[in-house]
């Protein structure tokens, strides 16, 4: 069972290193991890854009 926990931790380390923390948000999963939501048009007035979800038309927004 400990081996499963070790493999799970290694898996997350590899994913986090490969995702590139310096790059912007580019999918809905990383948008949620950064406490944002995907919005089809513009971000509402109380939110700011932190990236995109599924491409340019869908924005990732988070509270200011």
Swiss-Prot record:
Gene Ontology terms, MF aspect: CCR6 chemokine receptor binding; chemoattractant activity
Q: What range does the record give for the signal peptide?
A: 1-22
Q: Name its cellular compartments.
A: Secreted
GO BP terms in the entry: cell chemotaxis; defense response to bacterium
Q: Disulfide connectivity?
A: 31-60, 38-53, 43-61
Name the GO cellular-component terms.
extracellular space
- What InterPro entries does the database record attribute to this sequence? Beta/alpha-defensin_C, Defensin_beta-like
The record's section on Pfam families has: Defensin_beta (PF00711)
Q: Which UniProt keywords apply?
A: Antibiotic, Antimicrobial, Defensin, Disulfide bond, Secreted, Signal
Q: Does the keyword Secreted apply?
A: yes
Membership in a protein family: Belongs to the beta-defensin family.
Q: What does this protein do?
A: Has bactericidal activity.
Q: This protein is called what?
A: Beta-defensin 2
Query: What lineage does UniProt assign to this protein's organism?
Result: Eukaryota, Metazoa, Chordata, Craniata, Vertebrata
User: Which gene is the coding source of this polypeptide chain?
Assistant: DEFB2
């Amino acid at each position: 069972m400990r081996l499963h926990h070790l493999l799970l931790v290694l898996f997350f380390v590899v994913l986090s290193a490969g995702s590139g923390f310096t790059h912007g948000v580019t999918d809905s999963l990383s948008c949620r991890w950064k406490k944002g939501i995907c919005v089809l048009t513009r971000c509402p007035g109380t939110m700011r854009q932190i990236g995109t979800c599924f491409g340019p038309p869908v924005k990732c927004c988070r509270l200011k």
